[in-house]
Amino acid sequence: SYLFRKMIPVFKEAGYRVVVPDMVGFGKSDKFESKYDYSYEHHIEVMKELVERLDLKNATHFGQDWGGLVGLRVVAEMPDRFQQVIVSNTGMVAGKGAAAWITRRMVELAVWWNGPITFEELKTAAKDALNSENSSTSDGVSMFTKWIAHSYYSEDMDIVGIIETFGRLELSDGEKRAYEAPYPSGKYKAGAHVWPYLIPTQLKENEKYWQEVYEKWDKPFLVAFGGEERITIRMKDDFVNRIPNPTIITLGGA
C-alpha cells in the first residue's frame, strides 16, 4: 500500500473512502516463510474475504500490477459490489485448454533453464525491453522469464534496487527504509520471491471470467496505461479488444 502513498490523500481530500490492502506476504500483512505456501488462488480468496468483511458496495476498483491479476478476479467473482473499474499497467493473463497448460509448463521450463539470475544480469536483459522504442515481443518475454527466474531463486531480493531500477526512480533514504521495513531478513520476502512464478497458474480460470464477466461488462471501464510502459503494455490489447466500449487514455511520463 505504501506504493500509493501519494494517491491516497488526493482521493481522501475529494471525499472518497480509500481501501488499499497489503496483500499477504507484503507490507504489514502476515507473511509465510516458505514460498510454497503461497498461491494465486489464495490471494484471490483473501481479497474476496476483505471485500466481504468491509462490506464494500458501489466500489471503484483500481488495479495496477497485481491489482489486475488478483483484483480483476475479485471483481469478476463479486461484480455486484463494484460500480466501475480502472486498470493501469496490468492485465489478467488467460489461456484456453491445452494452450494454457502448455504456456504454464513453458514458463516453468524457461525458469528452470535460466536458473538463478543475478540482479546485474536481470538489468542487462531488461535494457532492450525497457529502453528501446522498437523492442519486440520476444524481448519482453525473454526479459520477463528472466525476472521470474531472478525472483524465484532469490534468497534476499533487493527490493529497493528493483523499485529504483525498473521504476526509474531515485528514492529518498526515508522511502528506502519504508520499502524495506516489512522485511527484516530474506525469509520474510518469500511472497515477493514466488509471486511472478505464480502468474501462469490460473490461465484457464482467468479465461473463464474473461468470457463470462468482462466480455459482457456493462459498467464504466477505464484503461489508463503509461505512455512509456514497455512490459505490461502487451496486455493492454485484452482490455481494448475484449471489454465492451472501454474508455482508453494514455498517461504521459508514466
Language-model segments: which ranges?
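Primarily extracellular surface-attachment and macromolecule-engagement regions
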Residues: 1-4, 10, 17, 68
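Flexible "cap/lid" subdomain of the alpha/beta-hydrolase fold that forms the substrate-access gate
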Residues: 3, 26-62, 66-247
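Conserved alpha/beta-hydrolase
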Residues: 8-34
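Short glycine-rich catalytic loops that host catalytic nucleophiles or stabilize transition states
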Residues: 249-254
